[in-house]
Amino acid sequence: MDLANPGALKALMAQYGLRPQHRLGQNFLIDGRVLDGIVSAAGLEPTDVVLEIGPGLGTLTQRLAAKAGRVVCVELDRGLVQVLHDTVQKAYDNVEVIHGDAGRIDLHKLLGERLAPGQKAKVVANLPYYITTPLVMRLLEEELPLSHVVVMVQKEVADRMVSPPGSKAYGALSVAVQYYTEPRIVLRVSRASFMPQPEVDSAVVSLRYRERPPVDAPPEAFFRVVRAAFGQRRKSLVNALTSLGVEKAAVHAALEAAGIDPGRRGESLSLEEFAAVARTLWQRT
């Protein structure tokens, strides 16, 4: 059964007495071209271990299972877990379905038990929109054994991930994503590619992990500066960074030493400039 077929999907849901749960962001992808594009972007090999978050009814899972060595699905909705057990897990011996909350489950343990020594997994998923940003940040910050993330996200979130300094969409998420990975938008996806249709369009993003950060600064100091700068976007840097508990005069001196105009705002700074501020500020405190 091709689960990307709308008729088959409706019949399957009726068979199990299920309806899409809006509170869980359940919009099922039914566009075969987009599904194939996601799998292609992940560049799957027969030895790959894939973590799929929010597999829904298994439309993407089918295609992942045909390409990867192992697919581990984490699904929050108990009703969908039963469907996944009866369909994709029984049809593919390389699929494992886990009932759990991807925002809380111990991903280090989950992946560590399924990877060979030195191996890294890939995350490939159509993410529920209500958890996109915190989940992506978790995948970035927790030093998980991951090499590549390919996910469907809300169009506006995708734009934020790849936005350059000075653009309207540039923010703390942009900096974090570009610090840890090399991001690119793979596909723009119409809301008509889903059932039921969401209220927004989407995009598929590829986040390939860097071997090392692109800038030289202590990570904790770097991200403290970033959070402070974007936490009060309308304020100048010299005023926003005082929220770090540093005297305004010391902030002013650190900015000037880094070659940064104290009157600039956080959204105008590049990663290298944030790193320069972090280095000079922490040398003076």
From Swiss-Prot:
Annotated binding of S-adenosyl-L-methionine, by residue: 27, 29, 54, 75, 101, 126
EC identifiers of the protein: 2.1.1.182
Annotated compartments: Cytoplasm
Keyword Transferase: yes
Pfam families reported in the protein's UniProt record: RrnaAD (PF00398)
Disulfide bonds: none
Top-rank taxon, per record: Bacteria
MF annotations from Gene Ontology: 16S rRNA (adenine(1518)-N(6)/adenine(1519)-N(6))-dimethyltransferase activity; RNA binding
Keyword annotations: Cytoplasm, Methyltransferase, RNA-binding, rRNA processing, S-adenosyl-L-methionine, Transferase
NCBIfam families listed in its UniProt record: ksgA (TIGR00755)
Known function: Specifically dimethylates two adjacent adenosines (A1518 and A1519) in the loop of a conserved hairpin near the 3'-end of 16S rRNA in the 30S particle. May play a critical role in biogenesis of 30S subunits.
Listed name of the protein: Ribosomal RNA small subunit methyltransferase A
